[in-house]
Amino acid sequence: MPRTVLLVILWAAVAAVLVALPHALSFSQQEILVFMTINLLVVASYRLLTLTGEWSLGHVVIVGVGAYASALYTKELGIPVPVSMLLGACTSALIAMGLSYPLFRMKGFYFLIGSFAAGEIIRLLWKRFREPFGGPKGIKGIDPMPDFSIGIWDFDFFEPVSYYYFAGAVVALCLWLLWRIERSPVGLTFHAVHWQDKLAQSAGVNVRAYRTLAFVVASGFAGLAGALGAHYIGTINPNGFDVETMVFVLTWTIVGGTATFYGPLMGCIALTVLNEIVLREMGFEQMRPLIYGAVLILSILFLPKGLESLVQKLVKPRRVEP
Amino acid sequence: MNPFLEIDRLTMRFGGLTAVDGLSFTVEHGAIHGLIGPNGAGKTTTFNAISGFYRPSGGEVRLRGEVISGLSMHEVARRGVIRTFQHSTLFAEMTVLENALMGTHMAFRPNVFAAIVGWDREDRRGAYARAVEALEFFGLEGLRGERAGDLAHGHQRALGMAIAYAAHPDVVLLDEPFTGMNPEETTRMMELMRKLRDSGVTILIVEHDMHAIMGLCDRITCMSFGKLLAEGGPAEIRSHPDVIEAYLGGARHVS
Amino acid sequence: MFDLLAQTGLNALYAASYISLVAVGLVLIFGVMGVVNFAHGELFMAGAYVVVALYAGGGAPFLLAVAAGLGFVGLLGLLMEFALFRPLRDNPLGGLVASIGFLMILQATAVMGFGVRMEHIPPVTQEVIAFSEKVRLPMSRLYVIVAAVVLLGALWYFLKRTRFGWALRASAQDAEAAALQGISIGQTARIAMFIGAGLAGVAGALTAPLVSVNPHMGHSVIVTAFIVIIVGGVGSLEGAVVASVAYAFVHTLVTTFWDGVIADIVGLSLMLVVLIVKPTGLFGTADRA
Ligand SMILES: Nc1ncnc2c1ncn2[C@@H]1O[C@H](COP(=O)(O)OP(=O)(O)OP(=O)(O)O)[C@@H](O)[C@H]1O
Ligand SMILES: [Mg+2]
């Protein structure tokens, strides 16, 4: 029992810090905090996809699918925002389901390039078709989350702090779901498909179905992240989901490491803090990409297993028992 | 009544090379059936064609009269045919227990929603029990927390079989299960295989250890250059002139 | 109509010549090093900036600036080999990530050195060959076409007729086997990186007066190069050239009759179809994935 008590106290402390955190930050830092929170969901969903061993370059576009879908549902169909976000997530999952048919005929490097091509085609369609996607300028004036109040607390979702609480709660729930999936027999099967797809097949695993499952579930969560972002910023455009953004996601994931659930989250937090806060405060505006690139190279050279490997050295991993 | 497992004029070509050439034989239900032949004879290729790893260039494989050749590997597995691999093919990064758990995949099919909500407790418990049973059967229960890639060679072979065993197969195809085992381990493993057979599992085994094959098999098929060379009981095969010839002179290369 | 087609053909020929220089370099690096060099577009960009600095800024002769572009970017390739790909030899994904880091560094350096605005470079020549009223080929484009043919011819000669070229092709097939034949892996890697990067640099240098030079110009170049090497077959140099020509014609044609974005979509769709139907590419046989 004392372990459980300890865990409860630990998590309560973490929650308290997370709740108090925005009040210690400046306004612009609060905004960054909101984006970072949403990005945590993006990298966590990306990791689910990589569990089966495939690396996609189309994930950010899938995030964009959720953003565009949710924005359009509110704008064109008048669907209320929280519902449209969920529908946006479903749209991403559905699109991923459709893409899985051509894409999972490929593996490895070919999948990487194929996912890039598929994503880029979707992005160019947004750019090309003014109706309904708004062309290169994208969609402006996306409905925000409606204000609401619980008792004494009023949430005005133009305020980064309010939106941080909202997005934080959603993201925390999603991370918990992703974690449950990973720790389940389904997650074990994902790992198995990654390490030895032949052996997995000979144990009766439908490898293609599991790859698709990981892709679709990951895309659903990615779409939700996109929708969360769209209704906060209020405007989206095709360039926001281009390959450069994808490179950031890839970098967070790799610098953090992909062997553990927390690796990509660590990567996202560490690099966001470095990029947005440390380098900005130090006044290296133009040099930021340079330092970022250098950090990327140094970490892959000297910390190839990611930041998570530092933690793993400290805490011996415990193995699953039911 | 249909024969249990029937390999019928099976042919497998790779470009110009015909690795299996019109091979036919049948495996009786509940038998331990050996498939032998010199290196490069096409034994592994035959296994690959039976288990759905390859789509045969010609011929058929039938299980209880149903054609299973051309199905994909997991579909063949779901019909009860489970294979092991010649080289220690394991989920090297996972623990021994997790490896065995993968063997229970078909009996306890995972489900995302159940897993999230927590409605799969029963299944998880069942899978765990089955996995532990498989490890115990092959004497691996003490190693369940080890990383599979760190195991000694003999243990790795045993774990490969434990995964197959956990899947409740009707037929297992074992490709050189005794390599990397010392004589005691081999003897123990032979005992386990007889036990496995007695529990109703049909075994098709490829093995170069003649001592083991002769001591274990009810029936043996010998192939060379992809073709059937001889078939019969151990005594017949041991004294069959073509078999002796193939092993002494006809082999393309000697191991 | 005929005029339009002829003009489109000339435009495509020009596009094909610099695309194939870039793509052949990318294939060479992938073949020998086994890494996908994401920074290849930025090597192209670096070549263009050498011309900006030496020819537009320093008043050096154009050809000298182009040669300097080849040499300088070739050296960047050697630097990448030494600092990134050699230490990461056993980690192809790591090599890819490192090349992304290098890409960011190159881009940021260009931004800091030259600013984000487009550079306007004085044209090398104003002359135009007019085949008819509407079919015209500017001399400066002809130079690019001629240079590409000469360089690719030289590369072909080098690969097929010299010992080093033979070594390079051998290690692209099978590095271990080539090493057993007494060919140093390190040496072939350095040659491949110098040539591969140099080709991207020279392509950027040659086209610099004809395009808008800016720090982000590499992006569309690398996308095009990927399409081309996939369609041509990842391991095949000849395939890369043929696919460059084919892609340039299709892209230019669609751009002329519809618009550039549709042309990009068509190009990407072509690549996707090839990936689905024949992942080894139209000319490739080796499966190195
Ligand atoms: N995927 C393949 N492509 C081309 N040739 C193959 C392939 N697989 C096997 N072969 C060839 O088919 C022949 C039979 O090989 P196979 O592995 O079935 O022999 P084997 O009887 O299992 O030999 P061993 O006892 O050494 O395991 C060999 O000549 C081999 O080179
Ligand atoms: Mg074999």
Residue ranges and their predicted role:
Chain B
Residues N2-S255:
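Glycine-rich phosphate-binding loops of nucleotide-dependent enzymes
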